[in-house]
């Protein structure tokens, strides 16, 4: 059997054991983590205790965050043994009343491993795919003939098997080398769904799959075993949103879909259905062609049938936590129709924890951090006719599910001889779900993974070159790879996955929620508080951070005490950690403000002390970062004036931050008419601005002559 991984312990200190994974997290983040030598409770640990002591309850202290990190040593220094060690399975300890993923002994805990990682090849794992004419699904009897009609009406065939070498060479030049502009060919508004769609096609001649749109799933070309399982679980009829979304997904177009709320989960059953449909069609195509080749060999005929990539893995699904992976795997099991799941108990032990954050946290927070919220996993799934194998070798897997950090640790091992990335060479469907959670963890790891997807392998792993498609051999797989991106709200980094990192010749479809003044976040605050939007000039997105900083220190800070009705209770919210460090340094060296600062890397003792001093008025001004708010969701006491250095990426945070002032008003610590919210923005903030004020107001604020706007 293929070996699994665990961390070696001989001769390695406890600090060194933890260092590799921890420093990988921080080395590409926006700034280096401060060294922390405090005890366990001083760390920002998402996975550990949510409970509070009595003193902290008075200021709404609930603990969620990232693990306490040790900064000493070189990045990755303790990870050199990962790719040659045995994996040791560990169970989780669940303590009633709080979320407890057992990390009390990092050297022994499976949480310090990449759960599911298995990159070694097993020669026996491919035996079930040998020629077996009886192994083809029963539904295939009606698909034996590759008629022109079938090839042209099945998106799988028209997308992956019909494009010619000449066509792909021509499109490669236009799309990748000349970088010609994509054309917008269709814009639609679905008023009943409060959604708009935008369709973009590549330059030249796009692949034209059959564009069927139906509310009945059985009218699409879906494998019978998947279709039957889906209809048994969810019925034959699709909702309006599902029928709108399933069309571009099944037609192998790239999709960027904003689901608006964590409660909207129906899209997940659609992409799992699509992933299984793709896997089973690929498998059946290979088995049929193998049977044809055997028959031709007996008749002394020569056939060229190309139906494979360099490696077996065809679908990659990136997710933020083990709990989210558990949910997707359960969905795959439900729709696959498999009668047996190998290693299911082991999977449940490593990926499932029945626990949740406290009930007084926001619902979206409870959803994000429920269950096993470790962001450290990478697991392969292999499907056969009647069974599913979990923890299959990556080179024998059909689907790989991974967190970006877990996958990047395999892709970029500091020892170049131990790096593994060939198993991503033949990915044909890439799915990135819950992108906003991943972005708050560390988006750099997504960029790392994207560098290796569809990269020509350094070794060929016994591949049969007579069966490999020419577009794989010619390094053109990226032109046919489908990318599906699902997020709650759009950010520039997430948008770039489709806009600049995807080159799918079938085109791209971007779905966008309609946000007007009525359903904008500003309209849901529930407080008649003065909100001033202040625009500053910025020549380009690259120059925007410098322009924002100069405007802040020259125009906002000098008049801060004059414009505020209160000399204390001033909070400055800063989304970017880079900007936070810059402003913090300026306040420390160039002003006489009595200020405090807390961020996602602050120790627990500092977080508690600073918040208490700010609430009591001892500290007049407080710097507060977006990632700290994401991981903790504090309700800061004592806020009377709120300055937003930039708009939060999550629109919910806008409402929560302003309600800090509402809390002070309720406690009669300030007057609602005297409280103030001021927001800095530039024309490059249009996407974020639209989420706050609506699509009618945002263009006015960005482009009109006035630079200052007041709302209540």
Curated annotation (Swiss-Prot):
Alphabetically, which GO biological process terms does the record hold? maturation of SSU-rRNA from tricistronic rRNA transcript (SSU-rRNA, 5.8S rRNA, LSU-rRNA)
Which PANTHER family does its entry note? ORF PROTEIN-RELATED, U3 SMALL NUCLEOLAR RNA-ASSOCIATED PROTEIN 25 HOMOLOG
The UniProt annotation puts the region (Disordered) at 1-72, 85-159
Q: Where is the composition biased (Acidic residues)?
A: 50-69, 108-146
Keywords from the UniProt entry: Nucleus, Ribonucleoprotein, Ribosome biogenesis, rRNA processing
Query: What does the similarity note say?
Result: Belongs to the UTP25 family.
Q: How does it assemble?
A: Component of the ribosomal small subunit (SSU) processome composed of at least 40 protein subunits and snoRNA U3.
Say where the protein is mainly found.
Answer: nucleus
Its localization reads:
Nucleus, Nucleolus
According to its UniProt entry, this protein's organism is Candida dubliniensis (strain CD36 / ATCC MYA-646 / CBS 7987 / NCPF 3949 / NRRL Y-17841)
Q: What is this protein called?
A: U3 small nucleolar RNA-associated protein 25
Presence of keyword Nucleus:
yes
Give me the stretches of Basic and acidic residues compositional bias: 15-26, 34-43
Function, as annotated, reads: DEAD-box RNA helicase-like protein required for pre-18S rRNA processing, specifically at sites A0, A1, and A2.
Q: Which GO terms describe its cellular component?
A: nucleolus; small-subunit processome
UniProt-listed InterPro entries: P-loop_NTPase, UTP25, UTP25_C, UTP25_NTPase-like
Which Pfam families does this chain map to?
Answer: Utp25_C, UTP25_NTPase-like
Write out the GO MF terms. Answer: rRNA binding; U3 snoRNA binding
Quote the biased-composition stretches of kind Polar residues, using this chain's numbering. 93-107
């Amino acid at each position: 059997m293929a070996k699994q991984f665990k961390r070696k312990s001989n001769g390695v200190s406890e600090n060194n054991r933890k260092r590799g994974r921890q420093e990988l997290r921080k080395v590409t983040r926006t700034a280096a983590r401060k060294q922390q030598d405090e005890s366990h409770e001083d760390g920002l640990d998402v996975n550990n205790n949510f409970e509070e002591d009595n003193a902290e309850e008075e200021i709404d202290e609930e603990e969620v965050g990232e693990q306490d990190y040790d900064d000493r040593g070189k990045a990755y220094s303790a990870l050199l043994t990962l790719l040659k060690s045995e994996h040791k399975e560990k169970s989780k300890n669940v303590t009633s009343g709080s979320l407890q993923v057992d990390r009390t002994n990092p050297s022994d805990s499976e949480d310090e491993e990449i759960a599911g990682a298995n990159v070694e090849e097993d020669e026996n794992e491919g035996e079930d795919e040998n020629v077996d004419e009886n192994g083809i699904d029963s539904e295939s009897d009606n698909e034996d003939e590759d008629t022109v009609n079938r090839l042209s009406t099945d998106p799988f065939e028209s997308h992956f098997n019909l494009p010619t070498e000449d066509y792909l060479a021509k499109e490669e030049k236009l799309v990748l080398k000349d970088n010609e502009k994509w054309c917008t060919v269709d814009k639609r508004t679905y008023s009943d769904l409060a959604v708009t769609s935008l369709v973009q096609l590549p330059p030249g001649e796009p692949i034209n799959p059959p564009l069927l749109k139906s509310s009945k799933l059985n009218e699409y070309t879906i494998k019978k075993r998947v279709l039957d399982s889906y209809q048994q679980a969810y019925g034959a009829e699709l909702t309006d949103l599902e029928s709108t979304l399933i069309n571009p997904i099944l037609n192998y177009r790239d999709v960027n879909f904003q689901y608006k709320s964590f409660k909207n989960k129906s899209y997940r059953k659609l992409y799992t259905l699509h992933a299984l449909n793709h896997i089973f069609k690929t498998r059946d195509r290979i088995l049929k062609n193998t049977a044809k080749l055997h028959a031709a060999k007996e008749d002394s005929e020569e056939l060229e049938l190309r139906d494979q990539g360099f490696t077996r893995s065809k679908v990659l699904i990136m997710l933020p936590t083990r709990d989210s992976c558990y949910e997707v795997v359960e969905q795959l099991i439900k729709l696959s129709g498999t009668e047996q799941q190998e290693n299911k108990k082991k999977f449940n032990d490593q990926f499932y924890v029945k626990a949740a954050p406290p009930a007084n946290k926001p619902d979206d927070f409870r959803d994000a951090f429920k269950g096993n919220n470790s962001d450290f996993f990478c697991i392969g799934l292999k499907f056969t006719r009647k069974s599913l194998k979990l923890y299959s070798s990556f080179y024998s897997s059909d689907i790989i599910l991974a967190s970006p950090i877990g996958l990047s640790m395999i892709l970029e091992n500091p020892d170049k001889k131990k790096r593994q990335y060939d198993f991503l060479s033949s990915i044909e469907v890439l799915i990135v779900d819950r992108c906003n959670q991943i972005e708050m963890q560390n988006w750099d790891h997504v960029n790392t993974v994207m560098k290796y997807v569809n990269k020509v392998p350094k070794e060929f792993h016994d591949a049969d070159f007579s069966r490999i498609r020419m577009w794989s051999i010619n390094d053109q797989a990226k032109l046919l790879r489908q990318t599906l991106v699902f997020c709650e709200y759009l950010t520039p980094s997430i948008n770039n996955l489709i806009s600049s990192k995807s080159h799918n010749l079938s085109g791209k479809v971007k779905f966008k929620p309609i946000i007007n003044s009525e359903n904008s976040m500003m309209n849901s605050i529930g407080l008649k508080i003065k909100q001033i939007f202040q625009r500053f000039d910025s020549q380009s997105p690259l120059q925007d951070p410098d322009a924002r900083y100069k405007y802040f220190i020259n125009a906002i800070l000098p008049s801060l005490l004059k414009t505020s009705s209160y000399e204390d209770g001033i909070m400055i919210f800063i989304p970017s950690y880079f900007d936070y460090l810059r402003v913090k340094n300026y306040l420390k060296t160039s002003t006489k403000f009595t200020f405090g600062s807390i961020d996602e890397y602050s120790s627990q003792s500092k977080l508690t002390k600073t918040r208490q001093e700010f609430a009591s008025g001892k500290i007049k001004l407080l710097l507060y970062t977006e990632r700290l708010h994401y991981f903790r969701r504090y309700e800061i006491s004592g806020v009377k004036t709120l300055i937003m250095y930039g708009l939060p990426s999550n629109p919910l945070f806008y409402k929560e931050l302003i309600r800090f002032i509402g809390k002070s008003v309720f406690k009669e610590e300030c007057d609602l008419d005297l409280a103030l919210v001021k927001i800095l923005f530039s024309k490059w903030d249009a996407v974020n601005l639209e989420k706050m004020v609506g699509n009618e107001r945002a263009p006015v604020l960005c482009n009109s002559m006035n630079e200052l706007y007041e709302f209540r």
